[in-house]
Amino acid sequence: MKKDISEILKKIINNLGYNLEEVTISKSNRPDLCDFQCNDIFKLAKENHKNPIELGEEIVGSVNNYEEFNTYFKEVTFARPGFINIKVSNDLINKYLKIIKEDEKKLLNQEPKETFVIDYGGPNVAKPLHVGHMRTAIVGESIKRIINYMGHNTISDVHLGDFGLQIGEVIYGVLRDKLSIDEIDIKYLDKIYPEMNAICKENEEIKNECANITKQLQDGNQEYRRLWKKILEVSKQDIKKNYDFLDVSFDYWYGESDAYDYLEETEKILKEKNLVEESEGALVVNVKKDSDTKEIPPLLFKKSNGAYLYASTDLSTILQRTKDFNPDHILYVVDNRQELHFTQVFRTSEKADIMPQEKLEFLGYGTVNGEDGKPYKTRSGNTPKLENLFNEAKEIFISKKEDNKNMSEEDVNKIVNSILKFADLSNTRTKDYIFDLNKFSDVTGKTGPYILYTYLRINKILKSQNKNLELSNNIYNEPDRDLRLKLLEYSDAINYAYKERMPHYIADYVYNLCVSANIFYQNNHIMNMEDEINKNDWLYVLTLTNKLIKQCLKLLVIDIPSIM
């Protein structure tokens, strides 16, 4: 709709003899005065050496004399010192509502289809999943769904950390405890990793032995490979169970180990392009740029003992992905604290002509904190395992209301998912946020349960009315008009979320849509409406409202329960 308004204003302005290539239309921050605003008068007045007030009044006068004024506008006024205030017509609003009913995707930005590889999830094998893993999984899954919805092809890869020092530590523990391979289970892994990690922090000799085991594993030691495969199998089962609960899925379950097949080729490329330098026996790549405002150290590709590092495997993984998928973009949904690491990797990739840096995107996310502003802990003071967090959220939700105890497990799980996911995705991806389960599980306020409640409330009305609805050109009151205009903001929210890789635009939108829908519902008694045209119009608007709420929830990885 903004595009229509922009084109009309541009045509009128150009017909007056002024040259303006693009007219900027923005949503009004004073909806009591107007729907949209144009702030280009100052720029245009400066370019044409005109008084902005005189110019603005001239343009608005011409708009009001436009032959199709009533088709597009209800009211267009000039506000000093240089703003054009626009109220759009019922005809224009309803025209776009009909497009949404037919296919809401028609209002989205259209781009040539591209292929995106999305790297998210990425837990380290043999470690229990904790609250921090929830963020990468949920944010990554949502971004994947948004990109798919925009018409692009996505390839998702969990990229497990399955070949690092933690594996050497666990293998050391297995050998020390003289376990048979069949005795390695998730209970043992949950116990042995933190135990060995603590020992290695205190005992340098054991730490070096674990590093040696890791190196031999990477070099192909058969016994260590046998134990590693069992550890990987057990750990993946647990990871999949947690990700299944979150409705997070991957096309590929590759790991760091898969990149080892490409390390020699990657090293060869770096050497052929004279990019590697020796530094105390190690191989490094200088990635510093003259324009850098902070120190960017060299990428350490290979240690002096011949061992490879995360930077080596991440670079080799880019090579692997270019060969396997030939993607247009590779996206990495990882902790903000990894930014320097990926800057080094991306710059090396570009210098080596593996993949240009502009096609590699670092999508950092902030941490999940408790009310004290520190990383979130359980009531007992521990960093919560993801499974324990699910159970804690269930307990809190069920305790909120007596009827919640009688809900099916499937419905409870869907609501718990909405609590966790909406809490996460309604916050700006790059920011830390305070995780408050009591607040996030309320049915009021900016929460997942509030969105679900609104949908089910509307759905109850719609299910009682089996009608093939058509829309008249009437709009009956301000809550009605506000809801219709809110429906038309949908495409902006999706376009912004896609462009910025920021799901919170969708979370913000669907919350505001639900607020408008509830105000509309409170002010308009639909079921008691005797005027059939009016009643049908309102049912039509509510049908569109639920259509968009449902689609937003899908993009936010939230399923709808049968009852609340």
Give, region by region, the residue ranges found by the protein language model.
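Non-catalytic interaction-recognition regions
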Residues: 2-94, 110-564
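Flexible, low-complexity linker/hinge segments
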Residues: 101-111
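Short, charged, solvent-exposed linker or helix-capping segments at domain edges/interfaces
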Residues: 95-101
